[in-house]
């Protein structure tokens, strides 16, 4: 596979802000990789972007599963050899149904923190060797 000018991975890129970020990067001519834990939604988002003329690829990626993160980094390394842009977008806000911020059960707080914080760290650490292969690698962290 020939390597495009720039390659970007967007975690949680299958919907919402992640999908729109992928779309806007794709419109700039950047090859986008949709990272999503749900294969069906990730594949559908990738097909949608391809239908818009964007160079898009899908990689299964659950940021809370180290094996998934490692496999995604290996696939991106094999297919592209580098990563120019990492957008850490995957995240969740879960108050546990009717709970308020001051009454959220601790197990929900732990799973939220695992995804929103430790997931970001895991992906960043796994992708750093690929980002270092870029002449001007970038990491963007966002929450919503």
Describe these PLM feature segments.
Residues 124-125:
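A short, exposed helix-loop element centered on a Lys and neighboring polar residues
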């Amino acid at each position: 596979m020939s390597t495009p000018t720039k390659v970007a991975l967007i975690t949680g890129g299958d919907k919402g802000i992640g999908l729109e970020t992928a779309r806007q990067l794709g419109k700039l001519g950047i090859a986008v990789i949709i990272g999503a834990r749900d294969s069906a939604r990730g594949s559908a988002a990738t097909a949608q972007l391809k239908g818009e003329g964007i160079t898009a690829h899908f990689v299964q990626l659950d940021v809370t599963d180290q094996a998934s993160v490692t496999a995604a980094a290996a696939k991106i390394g094999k297919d592209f050899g580098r990563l120019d842009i990492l957008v850490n977008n995957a995240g969740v806000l879960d108050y546990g149904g009717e709970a308020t911020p001051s009454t959220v059960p601790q197990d929900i707080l732990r799973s939220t923190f695992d995804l929103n914080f430790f997931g970001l760290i895991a992906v960043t650490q796994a992708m750093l060797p690929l980002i270092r292969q870029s002449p001007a690698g970038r990491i963007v962290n966002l929450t919503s």
